[in-house]
């Protein structure tokens, strides 16, 4: 066995002491491990060989995870914790990259061949192509449009109908105050640099990363300089505007396309801004997500549900993000379709009555603990994950199970699908638990669904901004008496003193809590006045303007600010994953490619193919087409010239699930029969023409399988009458 591995381990242990300062334990050792060549595995299994190569990387992640934990236990400065976490993420990326590099070659899709098929058969193409195209914008052709619509329809049936979710459809134009309240106006931004001569824009962190990687690949780059740059890359997500500007100067970063100087980094808001109305007085944005429309309509939705929790609302629609440098096809675009669910639930009652229906599902879970200890995702029963506390509660667990069933139903491979838990530093302070469904593609692992359990932070923000209570009422088992303390303003005196600002004062007083009111009551009794500040203005209130009222109140209901389970689906990313996971090349014929879409999402469920252009076949083509239409089966008639085998190949290439062929036996024999072909196996059966539309409908709806069809009907061996032709080339 070559001596690479022991030396690799020694290098790792030497470079990664457990309690070293974060700047010392930067990504240098990890980078060396990533670039190390894979060992030949002639004398042992490839799996054992891969695990040996991954062992030092797992060790590096585990050591850094322990280091992060110790920093937190020791209450180290936050800046040190942030650096250590950034290094942990860098090592995780190195480990994951090596895992992907070591996967079997037959597990990797031929992306170039697939993209050629997609373009040639017009699944989708760059928008405005005849004008040169616009990056990040795509038009879907007939096949892509049908596939996308079927993915959406399957989503509606799987979630909205099954869970009786309330679907709404909100406007894509959003006034600025809404997104100011949600935080998008202030925080939804990336840093951007611009070519000072031609104005070409680049995302600053991506450009800096590419530039440093290019410098590091130079053989003349010293080990010390390389280590320094690796440290910068490890911290890349944490740099602010000025730090990025300094790094661009230090490393002399230029435009990669022209070599021109670049402007200093500036924050670039990723929302498309516009103005609503002709006056230009109402700024607005194209929505960056669909969720805000659901939150704003919470009160109406709660009323529609008779005021009861839990309930869920959903929305499907386009969202917009003005990406600085969109890339990777459908994975990072500027306009995309989302499907989002907001499941509102009492935070004290997070038990789902239907959880047992998914509890026995086994799926790959990549827990936060596994990530910080360098372990891989492991298959786990969903019920066990909830019982052991890996997943926070059964409501979240139920939705993870339902997401898994949907994704596998529409064509995503279970072996290339995992659920990754957010680490503590990735979650917002108001979140309880978050999991992302991630699919393995030729681009690596990509997030396709997010599923978060969070307090309804958005509802609280919008309630404060609008003074509209966005809460539910929960009946109490027994009435309870509570002490109430509130300000009692003299509206006349306040109005006389502050006129148009009186409303501000009254709103402020109505929102004060008991503790604050008691403090101000003491000031009133001692000094006869107190001062408040609201919206940048100061107001002095005296005894004749306000008093304090104390009384008891009997409550029969209590207000509940709901928690929300929030599954958010990126339908474009799901579609791309399906394309990769279902793309195949026929064994023995490299030129014949096909997509093995499940029938439920196949663009066309069936093709109708006359054996030739013989006019005797046409009445049967018409009869079958009309019957398929009556049964709601999307189909494609291909009566063009060319051999039947070539036409089968054409329909396979766009993923048509089944094919009905009319031949001379159809014409010459009674009862009239035709063949039905399965795309994936290329096997055929023969059945009466009148039965076939119902059979295809049941196959497309998932009521029966191809195995059921083969058990019921005889396999087709070849036609018995008329001109003899080979059915498959």
UniProtKB/Swiss-Prot annotation:
InterPro entries the UniProt entry points to: aa-tRNA-synt_IIb, aa-tRNA-synth_II, aa-tRNA-synth_II/BPL/LPL, Anticodon-bd, Anticodon-bd_dom_sf, Gly-tRNA_synthase/POLG2, GlyRS-like_core, tRNA-synt_gly
PROSITE patterns named among the record's database cross-references: AA_TRNA_LIGASE_II, WHEP_TRS_1, WHEP_TRS_2
Coiled coil: none
Residue positions where N6-acetyllysine is found in the record: 194, 491
Residues with Phosphotyrosine modification: 443
Function: Catalyzes the ATP-dependent ligation of glycine to the 3'-end of its cognate tRNA, via the formation of an aminoacyl-adenylate intermediate (Gly-AMP). Also produces diadenosine tetraphosphate (Ap4A), a universal pleiotropic signaling molecule needed for cell regulation pathways, by direct condensation of 2 ATPs. Thereby, may play a special role in Ap4A homeostasis.
Name of the featured protein: Glycine--tRNA ligase
Species this protein is from: Mus musculus (Mouse)
């Amino acid at each position: 066995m070559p001596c690479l591995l022991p030396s690799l381990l020694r290098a790792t242990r030497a470079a990664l002491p457990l309690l070293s300062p974060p700047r010392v334990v930067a990504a240098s050792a990890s980078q060396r491990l990533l670039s190390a060549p894979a060992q030949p595995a002639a004398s042992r299994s490839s799996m054992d060989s891969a695990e040996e190569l991954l062992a030092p990387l797992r060790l590096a992640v585990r050591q850094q995870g322990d280091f992060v934990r110790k920093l937190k236990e020791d209450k180290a400065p936050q800046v040190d914790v942030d650096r250590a976490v950034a290094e942990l993420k860098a090592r995780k990326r190195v480990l994951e990259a090596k895992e992907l590099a070591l996967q079997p070659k037959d597990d990797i899709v031929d992306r170039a061949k697939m993209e050629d098929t997609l373009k040639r058969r017009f699944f989708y193409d760059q928008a405005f192509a005849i004008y040169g195209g616009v990056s990040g914008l795509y038009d879907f052709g007939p096949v892509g449009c049908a596939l996308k619509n079927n993915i959406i329809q399957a989503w509606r049936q799987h979630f909205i109908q099954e869970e009786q979710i309330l679907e709404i459809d909100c406007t894509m134009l959003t006034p600025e105050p809404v997104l100011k309240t949600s935080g998008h106006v202030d925080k939804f931004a990336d840093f951007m640099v611009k070519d000072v001569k031609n104005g070409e824009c680049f995302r600053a962190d991506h450009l800096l990363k590419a530039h440093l990687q290019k410098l590091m690949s130079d053989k003349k780059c010293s080990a010390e300089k390389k280590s320094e740059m690796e440290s910068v890359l490890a911290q890349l997500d944490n740099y602010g505007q000025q730090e990025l500007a300094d790094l661009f100067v230090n490393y002399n970063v230029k435009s990669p396309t022209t070599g021109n100087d670049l402007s200093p980094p500036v924050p670039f808001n990723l929302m498309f801004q516009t103005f609503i109305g002709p006056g230009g007085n109402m700024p607005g944005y194209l929505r960056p997500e669909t969720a805000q429309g659901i939150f704003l309509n919470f009160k109406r939705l709660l009323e529609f549900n008779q005021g009861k929790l839990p309930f869920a609302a959903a929305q499907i629609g386009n969202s917009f993000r003005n990406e600085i440098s969109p890339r990777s096809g459908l994975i990072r675009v500027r306009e995309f379709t989302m499907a989002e669910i907001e499941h509102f639930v009492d935070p004290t009652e997070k038990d789902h009555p239907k959880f047992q229906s998914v509890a026995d599902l086994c799926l790959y879970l990549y827990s936060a603990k596994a990530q910080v200890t360098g372990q891989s995702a492991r298959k786990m029963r969903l019920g066990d994950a909830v019982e052991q506390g890996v997943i926070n509660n059964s409501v979240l667990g139920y939705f993870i199970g339902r997401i898994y069933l949907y994704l596998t139903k529409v064509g995503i491979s279970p072996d290339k699908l995992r659920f990754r838990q957010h680490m503590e530093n990735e979650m917002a302070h108001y979140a309880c638990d978050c999991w992302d469904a991630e699919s393995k593609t030729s681009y690596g692992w990509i997030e396709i669904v997010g599923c978060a359990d969070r307090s309804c932070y958005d509802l609280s923000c919008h309630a404060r901004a609008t003074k509209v209570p966005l809460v539910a009422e929960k009946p109490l088992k027994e009435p309870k008496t509570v002490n109430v303390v509130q300000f009692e303003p003299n509206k006349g005196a306040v109005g006389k003193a502050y006129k148009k600002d009186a409303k501000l004062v009254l709103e402020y007083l109505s929102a004060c809590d008991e503790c604050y009111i008691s403090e101000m009551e003491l000031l009133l009794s001692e000094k006869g006045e107190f001062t408040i500040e609201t919206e940048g203005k100061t107001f002095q209130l005296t005894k004749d303007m306000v008093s304090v009222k104390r009384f008891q109140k009997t409550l029969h209901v209590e207000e509940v600010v709901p928690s929300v389970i929030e599954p958010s689906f990126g339908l474009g990313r799901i579609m791309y994953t399906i394309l990769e996971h279902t793309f195949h090349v026929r064994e023995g014929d490299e030129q014949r490619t096909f997509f093995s879409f499940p029938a439920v999402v196949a663009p066309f469920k069936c093709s109708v193919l006359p054996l030739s252009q013989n006019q005797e076949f046409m009445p049967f083509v018409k009869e079958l087409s009309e019957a398929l239409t009556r049964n709601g089966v999307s189909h494609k008639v291909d009566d063009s010239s060319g051999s039947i085998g070539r036409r089968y190949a054409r329909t396979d290439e766009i993923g048509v699930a089944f094919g009905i062929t009319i031949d001379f036996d159809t014409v010459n024999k009674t009862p009239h029969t035709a063949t039905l072909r399965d795309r994936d196996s290329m096997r055929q059966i023969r059945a009466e023409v009148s039965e076939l539309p119902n059979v295809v409908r049941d196959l497309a709806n998932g009521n029966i399988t191809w195995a059921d069809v083969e058990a019921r009907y005889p396999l087709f061996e070849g036609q018995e009458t008329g001109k003899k032709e080979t059915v498959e080339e």
